[in-house]
A protein has these predicted regions:
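Boundary/linker segments flanking structured domains
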Residues: 1-48, 52-141
Length: 141
């Protein structure tokens, strides 16, 4: 796990296969934060995507889309102009990915107010430093 994520207490993870329904497997909250997607092959896990949700406004308040992390993971668009609940299973079959493990972290709430895209950027920068590229499902940042 990335050290930037150890301070967040509202966190969990879930597994997902192409046969599962993402909306029933996803246990993320409606809070704002980041999520990391790992490709699982046996005991090995490889980070393949980092995402976030929630925008901090000029006055320091958070603008969050309805549904927060849960909605971003399940209904956010990726690979097509359609929600991940449809595109992830298709992409997993195409790439012969057996399972995904999704870890999510609320970064903005209560006393802790860390901008979700800042945390996303930190993790992506660390990945870039280590591997020389972004995770394969991150198109750009």
């Amino acid at each position: 796990m990335y050290k930037e994520l150890t301070k967040y207490k509202s966190t969990n993870h879930f597994s997902f296969t192409p046969e599962d329904q993402l909306e029933t497997q996803c246990n993320a909250t409606e809070g704002s934060g980041v999520f990391l997607v790992y490709e699982c092959k046996g005991e090995e896990k490889q980070l393949i995507m980092v995402g976030s949700t929630g925008t901090v406004q000029n006055d320091g308040t958070l603008k969050s889309k309805n549904g927060g992390l849960f909605d971003k993971i399940v209904n956010g668009h990726q690979f097509a102009k359609t929600g991940r609940k449809y595109s992830w299973p298709s992409q997993m079959k195409l790439e012969k990915i057996e399972a995904l493990e999704v870890h999510w972290f609320e970064t903005f709430g209560g006393k802790l107010k860390v901008i979700p895209t800042y945390v996303e950027g930190q993790i992506l920068q660390n990945y870039l430093n280590e591997f020389g590229s972004l995770p394969k499902w991150n198109v750009a940042f």
